[in-house]
Amino acid sequence: NQSIALAKAGVPVYHAGIVGTDGDILLDACKEAGVDTRYIRRMPVKGGHTMIQVDKNAQNCIILYGGTNQMQTKEFVDEVLADFGEGDYLILQNEINMLDCIIDQAYEKKMKIVMNPSPFDDKLSTCDLSKVYLFLLNEIEGEQITGFKDKDQILDAMAEKFPNARFVLTLGSDGAVYYDGKEKVF
């Protein structure tokens, strides 16, 4: 979704990853939107997917099947990142493996790392998130990371924990807020 949205906004986008035998819909949608798919590989297994259920408190409950999303290798990461460098943006989501390796290599190359910690899990604790330039997260992920429910407390705690980062906190039907550690823009 993020790759397609950025491509439709006119940004040159290269999507990297591994799809399974069920990946034609994704590949077709990416190509139709103008996303460069040269870094997408196919494996003879099912792709990863996520199911979102809503619980009795109207909160999302995410069920994740890793599939091909968990098949990144160091060699594949090296191959993809070899073509990118300083100032290039790298958008990551927590659905894939090798995040710690990807973040470390991208940071060494002075890329701007954008992290969407969805779906949130303990795997993120293995990553040096101080290397992240921008976090894209919702209120639930913000609470999981900081322990706070209030949007201002979430943003303040994130800025304290990651003082060099910027943040976009999505608020469902209430929109979103951007925070650079100094000013909050709704």
Region locations from a protein language model:
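Conserved phosphate-binding/catalytic loop of the ribokinase/pfkB sugar-kinase fold
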Residues: 15, 40-42, 52-89
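Short, well-ordered alpha-helical microsegments
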Residues: 23, 98-100, 121-125
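Short beta-strand scaffold segments in enzyme catalytic cores
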Residues: 49-53, 61, 175-179
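Conserved phosphate/ATP/ADP-binding segment of small-molecule kinases
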Residues: 108-112, 118-185
